[in-house]
Structure formats: structure tokens, C-alpha cells
Amino acid sequence: MVRASGDKLVSLANMTALSALIGLPLIFFVPLPSREVWGLLALTTLLHTGYKIFLVRAYAHGGLGHVYPLARGGAPLLVAGAGFVLLGETLSPASLAGMLLVTLGIISLAFRKNGGTQDEKRATLYALITAGFIASYTTVDGIGARLAETSFAYVAWLFVLDGAAFTALALWRRGPGAAWSPATLLRQGLPGALLQVVAYALVLWAMTKAPLGLVSAVRETSVVFAALISSLILKEKLGPMAAIAALAVAAGVILIEG
């Protein structure tokens, strides 16, 4: 949705603003965060904002089939590593094998076509930075959801704070007249906002029941659908090696589930 839009910053801000509006009424029915959780919410708001900034930059230089597998497929390795270091979560041999597949898939995507054009190199760099932000906020949010009274309370506050921060940034960068009409908001942002809120609420709930790396890995199986969308709908030329790499990343994250 963001990749196919004209102004990607405004499109992402539309979706984020609507996510905040969805979360806003919910905060009146959930407990206030503790001081510890407030700190995590402040940190993750910065991380979510950084993620969106670099995602927009990545899509400015590369296609969905190149950027999305790198950004999303790279995160489970980092999340699993953080889970081991911070929480003592261990991985099965199958999970380790999955990580190897993910790594090989990422390398294949990052260095295809003899290194790629200058734009592709920039897209690769920004996508890998995006993966770092995804892994960071996923880890922080997983810990925050466990510390909060309920994971859904954490999600409600997260979307309100994240939406306020990124919308303010987008207004500062683009101004109040840049496609902020109600019709534009609803058309560009509502479907993505609803999916984002529901999906991430389920992800954080799952992270209170299972290791962070495993949940993150299952979430990132969407790289296969992104590869298909980029080829069939956006008409991006992936090439056989890129398609195989995307499938390798998907197979890897399934193995990580163990």
C-alpha cells in the first residue's frame, strides 16, 4: 500500500494517524501504564518513527520485492538474538537452521545482479537499517506487553503515541495542505490502519505466550505474499534469483517457528 502510493510519507502518516484514532477511545477503558512501561512506550515510539522514516527512504530507491524481504526477513534473527541475551530465550536446532536460510535469503537479495544499481544499493542499506528498527521495536514491545497489565492496554497506548509522533513529523515535513483531506485519509489509510492495529495486537498478545523470536518469525512469513504482490500487481521484475531468495527467507522463518 505504501509502496504503491505517490507520496509515501503522507500515505504512511495517513495510516498511522488513523491507527491512533482507533487506539484513542480504547485508552479510556484500559489501565494506565506503570512507570516502567511508560519508559518502554517512549522508547518504542522513537523506534517506530525511525522505522517509518527509513522504510520510506528504502521504498524511494527500491521495489517492494527487494525492500520488503530484507526489512521484514532480517528482523527475526535480531529479535531471536535479543530474546536470548535479554530474556534467556533459547532456540531449537530447527530454529537455527531457519536462521541460516533467512541469512542466505537476505544475502541473495542484497547482492543480486552483481551488486545492483546505485539505487538498489541505497535501497538495500535503508532496508537493512529498517530491519534493525523492526527488531528493536519488536523486542521492546514484546517486553512491554509482558510488563503491562494486559497486552491490549500496551497496544492501545502504543498506537496513540506512535500516531501522534509520526503525524506531527509528517505535518512538519509536508505541511497541513499535503493530501490530508478526510477522503484521502479514509481511502489511503483506513484499510491499512485496521489491519495494522488488529495484526499487531495479536502479535503482542502472542509474545506474552511464546518466545519473541518465534512470534516474530511467524509474522514475517508475509515476505512470500509481498513477493507475489510485487510481481503480479505492481509489475516489478523480480528475476528468478530474487524469487528464490524470498522463498528462502519465508522457509527460514517457518523453520524458526520450530
Question: Language-model segments: which ranges?
Answer:
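Juxtamembrane helix-loop-helix junctions in multi-pass membrane proteins
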Residues: 1-18, 136-161, 214
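Membrane-interface interhelical linkers
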Residues: 2-46, 50-64, 111-128, 159-209, ...
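Small-residue-mediated transmembrane helix hinge/kink sites in multi-pass secondary transporters
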Residues: 3, 56, 83-84, 142, ...
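Hydrophobic transmembrane alpha-helices of multi-pass small-molecule transport proteins
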Residues: 17-18, 23, 80-84, 94-113, ...
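Hydrophobic/small/kink-forming positions within alpha-helical transmembrane segments
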Residues: 24, 45-53, 73-81, 135, ...
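Helix-coil boundary and interhelical linker segments in multi-pass alpha-helical membrane proteins
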Residues: 26-39, 79-95, 143-152, 205-211, ...
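Specific alpha-helical transmembrane segments that line the substrate/conduction pathway
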Residues: 43-48, 60-107, 153-156, 160-161, ...
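C-terminal structured domain segments across diverse proteins
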Residues: 209-210, 216, 225, 229, ...
